[in-house]
Curated annotation (Swiss-Prot):
PROSITE patterns: H15 (PS51504). The keyword Repeat applies. It is found in: Nucleus; Chromosome. This is Histone H1. The lineage of its organism: Eukaryota, Fungi, Dikarya, Ascomycota, Saccharomycotina. The gene is HHOA.
Amino acid sequence: MAAKKVTKDTKPGYKNLIIEGLKALNNGKGASRVALKKYIKDNHSDVASVSLFDSYFNNAIKKGIDSKEFHFPKGPSGVLKLVKPASTSTTTKAKTTDKKVTKKSTASKASEKKTPAKKTATATTKKVTKPKKDEKKKTTQKKSSAITYREMILTGVLSMNNGKGASRMALKKFIKDKYPTNVEKVVNFDYLVNNAIKKGVESGELSQPSGPSGMVKILKKGKESIKSI
């Protein structure tokens, strides 16, 4: 017996029928499932008469969604639409964007190369600002050159009573009269004067022959010290 010829099924698949229906019913807004089923039943009754028609129909829609040929703009219960293929203008825009990005990256690289100049400018600015530090040093030196209580007392003892000595009270008055700007706002003035006298006695620059409450006299070492001031 001759072998039977195998005939291929030329019926279009459900997905193709849905695409056909969408194109035929195209009004710019898509088509509902009901409208698509009606179109297939009206134009392909042999396919629509299959008992599992609804199952095949829904499965074809699902496959079309997965392959990005269909989409539901308003969700599965809304209308079904064909996905528009990417246009040539979109490709052109993409190329233009790539060119712009390339230009921007080139410009950014050029600006990166120029950054060392900024660093040099900053370094130069730092060098110019160095004299300010010198000014601070000068100010510090001026402050440190202010007369001390020791120096005021040595000067006072020499200036009063022909250098023969002076009482604490007389020395304090002398200091307030001669150096008002140095002591007028000092709260612990008495303490500073007494402490300076005590240190002068200990260092051998001053002496109190009659004891702490007596006259303050200047010694040879004190006279030599005051000359160097």
